[in-house]
Curated annotation (Swiss-Prot):
Its main location: cytoplasm. This is Ribosomal RNA large subunit methyltransferase K/L. NCBIfam families: PRK11783.1. Its EC number is 2.1.1.173, 2.1.1.264. It comes from Serratia proteamaculans (strain 568). The lineage of its organism: Bacteria, Pseudomonadati, Pseudomonadota, Gammaproteobacteria, Enterobacterales. Specifically methylates the guanine in position 2445 (m2G2445) and the guanine in position 2069 (m7G2069) of 23S rRNA. Belongs to the methyltransferase superfamily. RlmKL family. It is an enzyme of class 2 (transferase). It catalyses: guanosine(2445) in 23S rRNA + S-adenosyl-L-methionine = N(2)-methylguanosine(2445) in 23S rRNA + S-adenosyl-L-homocysteine + H(+); guanosine(2069) in 23S rRNA + S-adenosyl-L-methionine = N(2)-methylguanosine(2069) in 23S rRNA + S-adenosyl-L-homocysteine + H(+). SUPFAM superfamilies: S-adenosyl-L-methionine-dependent methyltransferases (SSF53335). Pfam families: Methyltrans_SAM, RlmL_1st, THUMP, UPF0020.
C-alpha cells in the first residue's frame, strides 16, 4: 500500500477527495491545498491518469525537523536515493517554504541537491546530473515552520497539462480548474452544454472528456515516474490500455452535445485544434459569434447547461463595458434559455449581480492568485420569467426624473454639457455628467466606514442603471473615482488616450477630454459665470488667472473683449486653452497665453485690466509655487495684488470652491475694495441640488460698485 498526496487549487480539496474515493483511494484526509490518501500500485497509476482535479501526485519519502541547514542536509541524505533512481538519470528539486534558519527557497533547494548528489557519491562514487529543463526525476520539498517533507513528484509536469492545448487565448483557465467548474455547474453527462465566450474551449473540452469517459492524462507524453526505480511498466501499460478502450467506447456511446462560440476568430481556431488533439472534436460545435447575437442552439430541446468564465476587468475604464455585457447576458439567458441551468465563474461577484438573476448555489475557488466565485442559476421555464431582481431602482427613478427635467432645459439653453445627478441619494454617492453623446460617472470616494465590496456593488448598480435609463452604449460611459484633491493630483494623468471631444456651451465651442484627467477641462458649475464674463467683457481687456483650459477667456473673447490674457502654471492646460481659443477663431497677439505661477505673476505684472476672473484652488502646495496657498487664509493678500491690476471702473469676478468660505469684508474695505456676492445668480438648474458647489463674488474699487 502506498501513502500518497494529491495537491490541488485552494477550494477544490473536497471535490478532489470525492474523485479519489471514486477511483478506489483509502484513508483520504483533506488538508489545505490537497488530499492525503492510500492505495496500491494500480491506484497510484489510476490517480495519475484519471484525476481531473489534482495538480500533482506526490510519493512522500521522509519527514523531519529542520532547525538548521545541516538538519535539512542530513534529513535528505538519510533517504536511500540510489534505490529511487539511477545515477544515469537527471533530477531537479522544487523547494517551497522558509523558516528562521532557511530563509531563501533557492538556498534550501541547493542544500537538498547537495545532499542527494553526496548520497550517490558516498554509495557508488558516481553522481547524477541536475537538469532544470525536463528532468527525469523531480524531488519536491516543502518546509513549514520546523518540519520538512520530502516527496517524489510522480507527475512530472503539472497534471493540468493534458497535452491537448497548444496556444491559448487571453487569460486561459487551467484544465484542472476548468474540470472543477464543469463538475460544480450542475451539468449532467448526456445533456447539452453551451459556452458563449469559450475562448480556447477548455471548459467544453473538459466536459466532453468527462462525457466520453476519456482519461485526462491519456495524451500526456511525459511522466515523473518513468525513471523511478519503483515503476511497474507492465501495470502502467495495462492501466493505459484499459483507459484507451473506455475512451473509444465512451466516444461512441455518449449522447452529449457541446456548443462553443467566441467573437475572436483566432481563438475559435485554437479551440478547434485543441478539441482535435483531445480526441473530442466530433462532440463540439464551435463558431464565431458575438454574445449579443447569442441564440439557443436547441430551441426545441432538450435543455442543458450554460457554463462560462466571462471576462472581468482590473482596469476602471473596462468596467462599464463589462457591466453592460453581464446585463445583456442576463437578459439573453432569461429570454432564450428558459429551463436551462446557468453557471458562471468569475473573480468579480459584483459583475455577476448585473445578470439580475438569483443564484441557487455558489462555490469559492482560487484561480491563481485571484479569489473567485462560481454561481449556479436555474433559468425559469417561461421567457423573462420570475427570479429577476431590480437593480438600483431608486437611483434609476431619480435619474429618469432628472433627465426629463434637465434634457429639455439644456436644449433650450443651448448647452450640451450638464450635471444629471449629484449624490441626490446618499447611498448612491456619485455624480453623473452628460457631455454631448457621452456620460461621465464620477464616484465620490466612500468613507472608510463603508464596506469596500458594498460600495463597489453600488457603483456597478449605478452604471447598470445609467446605461439602461439613458439607453447608452457601454463605450459612451466613462467611469472615474473622485477623491479629495491633494497638491497637484488634479494635474496628473489617469490615462494616455488623448481623445478630445468638441462640445457647445451657448455660443462657444470647447474641447473636453473625458478620460485622461480627473477633470474634463470644463467646470460645469461655472457655466453661468462664464456667460456673465462674456457679457461684461465687450471692448475691454480681460485677465484670466488660474485659467485651467481657458474656457472663461473663450467666452470673454466671443463677447467682444479687446484682449484676453490667460495665465496658468500648467503647460498642458495652456496648450489646451490655445486649442479652445483657436477653434473659436480667437487668434492673434490680442489673445495672450502666459505660462507662470499666478501668485508670482500678479506681484510682478505692470499692466492693468478692465475685467479680471480668478478661480484659485482651495489649497495648493505645488512644488512650482514658492509657498502654500489657502484661499480662506490668503484671499485678502490675493485681492491686494489684484487691486493694483484693476483699472478704474473695472471688475473682479472671484470664485472658489471652499465650503463655508467667509469673505473678509472689513479687510476688503481697508484695501479700498467693495464686494458683492453673486453665488445665487451663477448657479444653474443642474446644480440647484448642490448650493455649495462654489461661491462667487464681484469686487470693484470702493465707491464704484453698483
Amino acid at each position: 500500500m502506498n501513502s500518497l498526496f494529491a495537491s490541488t487549487a485552494r477550494g477544490l480539496e473536497e471535490l478532489l477527495k470525492s474523485e479519489l474515493e471514486a477511483l478506489g483511494a483509502h484513508a483520504c484526509k483533506v488538508v489545505q491545498g490537497g488530499v492525503h490518501f492510500q492505495g496500491d500500485d494500480r491506484l497510484l497509476y489510476q490517480s495519475l491518469l484519471w484525476s481531473r482535479l489534482a495538480s500533482r501526485i506526490l510519493l512522500p519519502l521522509n519527514e523531519f525537523r529542520v532547525h538548521s541547514d545541516l538538519d535539512l542536509y542530513l534529513g535528505v541524505q538519510a533517504i536511500d536515493w540510489t534505490s529511487i533512481f539511477g545515477v544515469d538519470k537527471t533530477f531537479a528539486v522544487h523547494f517551497s517554504g522558509v523558516n528562521e534558519e532557511i530563509r531563501n527557497s533557492q538556498y534550501g533547494a541547493l542544500k537538498v541537491k547537495d545532499a542527494i548528489v553526496d548520497s550517490f557519491t558516498r554509495k557508488i562514487e558516481q553522481r547524477p546530473t541536475v537538469a532544470k529543463q525536463q528532468p527525469d526525476i523531480r524531488v519536491n520539498v516543502f518546509l513549514q515552520r520546523d518540519m520538512a517533507s520530502v516527496a517524489l513528484d510522480l507527475s512530472g509536469e503539472g497534471l493540468h497539462q493534458r497535452g491537448y492545448r497548444d496556444l491559448t487565448g487571453q487569460a486561459p483557465l487551467k484544465e484542472s480548474l476548468a474540470a472543477a467548474i464543469v463538475q460544480r455547474s450542475g451539468w449532467q453527462p448526456g445533456t447539452p452544454m453551451l459556452d458563449p465566450m469559450c475562448g480556447s474551449g477548455t471548459l467544453l473540452i473538459e466536459a466532453a472528456m468527462i462525457a466520453s469517459d476519456r482519461a485526462p492524462g491519456l495524451h500526456r507524453q511525459h511522466w515523473g515516474f518513468t525513471a523511478w526505480n519503483g515503476h511497474n511498466v507492465d501495470l502502467w501499460r495495462e492501466v493505459i490500455t484499459e483507459a484507451q478502450v473506455r475512451a473509444r467506447r465512451g466516444l461512441q456511446e455518449t449522447t452529449s452535445r457541446f456548443f462553443g462560440s467566441d467573437i475572436d476568430r483566432r481563438v475559435i481556431e485554437m479551440a478547434r485544434g485543441n478539441a482535435r488533439r483531445a480526441g473530442v472534436a466530433e462532440l463540439i460545435t464551435f463558431n464565431v459569434n458575438d454574445v449579443a447575437k447569442l441564440t439557443n442552439p436547441l430551441p426545441e430541446g432538450p435543455t442543458g447547461t450554460v457554463v462560462c468564465n466571462p471576462p472581468y476587468g482590473e482596469r476602471l475604464e473596462s468596467e462599464p463595458a463589462l457591466i453592460a455585457l453581464h446585463n445583456m447576458l442576463g437578459r439573453i439567458m432569461k429570454s432564450a434559455f428558459g429551463g436551462w441551468q446557468l453557471s458562471l465563474f468569475s473573480a468579480s461577484p459584483e459583475l455577476l449581480s448585473c445578470l439580475q438573476l438569483r443564484a441557487e448555489r455558489q462555490f469559492k475557488a482560487k484561480n491563481g492568485p485571484l479569489d473567485c466565485v462560481q454561481k449556479n442559476y436555474q433559468l425559469a421555464e417561461n421567457p423573462l420569467g420570475a427570479g429577476g431582481v431590480q437593480v438600483a431602482e431608486d437611483f434609476a427613478n431619480r435619474l429618469r426624473k432628472n433627465l426629463k427635467k434637465l434634457d429639455k432645459w439644456a436644449k433650450q439653453q443651448g448647452i450640451e454639457c450638464y450635471r444629471l445627478y449629484d449624490a441626490d441619494l446618499p447611498e448612491y454617492n456619485v455624480a453623473v455628467d452628460r457631455y454631448g453623446s457621452k456620460v461621465v460617472v464620477q464616484e465620490y470616494a466612500p468613507p472608510k466606514t463603508i464596506d469596500a465590496q458594498k460600495a463597489r456593488q453600488r457603483l456597478f448598480d449605478v452604471i447598470n442603471a445609467t446605461l439602461a435609463v439613458l439607453e447608452l452604449p457601454s463605450n459612451q460611459l466613462i467611469l472615474k473615482t473622485r477623491e479629495r484633491q491633494k497638491g497637484k493630483n488634479q494635474y496628473e494623468k489617469l490615462a494616455q488616450k488623448g481623445e478630445f471631444l468638441l462640445v457647445e456651451e451657448f455660443n462657444a465651442k470647447l474641447w473636453v477630454n473625458l478620460t485622461d484627467y480627473l477633470d474634463t477641462g470644463l467646470f460645469l458649475d461655472h457655466r453661468i459665470a462664464r456667460r456673465m464674463l462674456g457679457e461684461m467683457s465687450k471692448g475691454k481687456d480681460f485677465l484670466n488667472l488660474f485659467a485651467y483650459t481657458g474656457t472663461a477667456s473663450v467666452h470673454a473673447g466671443l463677447g467682444g473683449a479687446r484682449s484676453t490674457t490667460t495665465v496658468d502654471m500648467s503647460r498642458t492646460y495652456l496648450e489646451w486653452a490655445e486649442k479652445n481659443l483657436r477653434v473659436n477663431g480667437l487668434t492673434g497677439k490680442q489673445h495672450r497665453l502666459i505660462h507662470a505661477d499666478c501668485l508670482s505673476w500678479m506681484q510682478n505684472a505692470d499692466e492693468q485690466f478692465d475685467v479680471i476672473f480668478i478661480d484659485p484652488p482651495t489649497f495648493s502646495n505645488s512644488k512650482r509655487m514658492e509657498n502654500t496657498f489657502d484661499v480662506q487664509r490668503d484671499h485678502l493678500a490675493l485681492m491686494q495684488d489684484l487691486k493694483r491690476l484693476l483699472r478704474r471702473n473695472g471688475t473682479i469676478m472671484f470664485s472658489n470652491n471652499k465650503r463655508g468660505f467667509q469673505m473678509d469684508m472689513a479687510g476688503l474695505s481697508a484695501l479700498g475694495l467693495e464686494a458683492k456676492e453673486i453665488t445665487a445668480q451663477t448657479q444653474s438648474q443642474d446644480f440647484a441640488r448642490n448650493r455649495q458647489i462654489h461661491n462667487c463674488w464681484l469686487l470693484t474699487h470702493a465707491g464704484e460698485g453698483k
